[in-house]
Swiss-Prot record:
MF (Gene Ontology): ABC-type transporter activity
Coiled coil: none
Xref: InterPro entries: ABC2_TM, ABC2_TM_bact-type, ABC_2_transport
Family: Belongs to the ABC-2 integral membrane protein family.
Subcellular location: Cell inner membrane
This protein's name: Capsule polysaccharide export inner-membrane protein CtrC
Keywords: Capsule biogenesis/degradation, Cell inner membrane, Cell membrane, Membrane, Polysaccharide transport, Sugar transport, Transmembrane, Transmembrane helix, Transport
Cited Pfam families: ABC2_membrane (PF01061)
Entry keyword Transit peptide: no
Organism: Neisseria meningitidis serogroup A / serotype 4A (strain DSM 15465 / Z2491)
Length: 265
């Protein structure tokens, strides 16, 4: 009897890469279709939402309230919030939408979750880059002070989005009503994520508690990279990284546990 070929770690990674790539294409076609602009909605949708927020703050003349560029302030907070919120929201339905695919030997529950979250992260990232580049060109905002620091903050928050998505998906799998209310909960969390404020402007007795929220550190770090020394920020990259690792390890462990009861044997 011919012995089955055992794949190496590198071969397994290549297989998983192809599987996730195929799931990504399936998700894009299923969600956006093949007609009209199709997959371009991947980043057009978050771009338009961000643009609406920017224009609203711009034309309501919120720049008269502060000397800070209010367009840049909005742009350095809202898209990042959309990334972790959308990634966690869409992670919830990833298993039910791809149940039939789990009968394929190389498709795992984790792959379906990763594919959806990567799609949301990619869309938010492209939207952030495109709209920031466009607004710099037309002179609405200045060139960022430290692009590398902004990139590091974005990567840390993308990592946070993945960890949060895994945990939320796991909780929703075990407690279905939670999946229905998470969208509302995440919406309520928007004001707490640092999108609409600098920690420095809060009362000192509140700052300690606000800095316990990992999303606040990501937003502060991203804005520190953009505005440079013109603003005072209180980010701690190591704290975000620690929170990310905890979420990732917890999420991976729980997903691995319930996957055994979902994937066909």
């Amino acid at each position: 009897m011919k012995e089955l070929h055992k794949t190496s770690f590198l071969e397994s990674l290549l297989i998983q890469k192809r599987v996730i790539g195929a799931l990504l294409m399936r998700e894009i076609i299923t969600r956006y279709g093949r007609n009209n602009i199709g997959f371009l909605w991947l980043f057009v949708e978050p771009l338009l939402l961000t643009l609406v927020m920017v224009l609203m703050w711009k034309f309501f003349r919120m720049h008269n309230v502060s000397a800070l560029n209010i367009v840049a302030f909005t742009l350095t907070g809202y898209p990042m919030m959309m990334m972790w919120r959308n990634a966690s929201n869409h992670a919830i339905g990833s298993i039910s939408a791809n149940t039939s695919l789990l009968y394929h030997r190389n498709v795992r529950v984790l792959d379906t979750i990763f594919a959806r979250m990567l799609l949301e992260i990619a869309g938010a990232t492209i939207a952030q880059v495109v709209i920031m580049f466009a607004l710099v060109i037309i002179g609405w905002i200045d060139v960022p002070a430290d692009i590398f620091y902004m990139l590091l903050a974005w990567l840390l928050m993308a990592m946070f989005a993945v960890g949060l998505g895994l945990v939320i998906c796991s909780v929703a799998f075990h407690f279905e009503p939670f999946g229905k209310v998470w969208s509302t909960i995440s919406f309520v969390m928007m004001p707490l994520s640092g999108v609409f404020f600098f920690v420095h402007n809060l009362p000192q007795q509140l700052q300690h508690y606000v800095l316990m929220i990992p999303m606040v550190h990501g937003t502060e770090m991203f804005r520190a990279g953009y505005f440079g020394d013109s603003v005072t920020t209180y980010e701690n990259p190591w704290y975000i990284l620690l929170c990310n690792l905890v979420l990732l390890l917890l999420g991976l462990a729980v997903v691995a546990r319930f996957s055994k009861g979902v994937e066909p044997q």
